[in-house]
């Protein structure tokens, strides 16, 4: 299975890079992982709604360029569906069983995802109603993908 994580912005903090590297190494046993970072646009402090939408569109266009036609796209969005780790593993397994061997997870920038990206998504997923820094969220997503594969393989995982 091919897993892509397409996210806005670069990881600068060493501790986050170390966690991403660790989960990437662990996941190599289960899937081919591709992490794609697109440039985040600068948001002025007093940006209008129109300016924010333009920024989301620019970031969205960069994201869409990296989504393959055959990808099952899962957008991480506050308005998405909240599910358990077991349900998340079922979602990944259902993709595989229905012939979707490529899953693209999409993480937006500080303003979220554009309507174009959300429209392209096959599934909208929320981890919580809380807001997280998108850099930290990448680590959280990798951990849940790793946990999902452990569940699917019947291997022990921390509950």
Swiss-Prot record:
GO terms for cellular component: cytoplasm. Disulfide bonds: none annotated. The keyword Ion transport does not apply. One of its GO terms (molecular function) is rRNA (pseudouridine-N3-)-methyltransferase activity. This is Ribosomal RNA large subunit methyltransferase H. Its EC number is 2.1.1.177. It catalyses: pseudouridine(1915) in 23S rRNA + S-adenosyl-L-methionine = N(3)-methylpseudouridine(1915) in 23S rRNA + S-adenosyl-L-homocysteine + H(+). It comes from Clostridium botulinum (strain Okra / Type B1). Keywords: Cytoplasm, Methyltransferase, rRNA processing, S-adenosyl-L-methionine, Transferase. It is an enzyme of class 2 (transferase). Belongs to the RNA methyltransferase RlmH family. SUPFAM superfamilies: alpha/beta knot (SSF75217). The keyword Oxidoreductase does not apply. It is found in: Cytoplasm. S-adenosyl-L-methionine binds at residues 76, 108, 127-132. Specifically methylates the pseudouridine at position 1915 (m3Psi1915) in 23S rRNA. InterPro entries: Alpha/beta_knot_MTases, RlmH-like, tRNA_m1G_MTases_N. Homodimer. It comes from the Bacteria. Gene3D superfamilies: 3.40.1280.10.
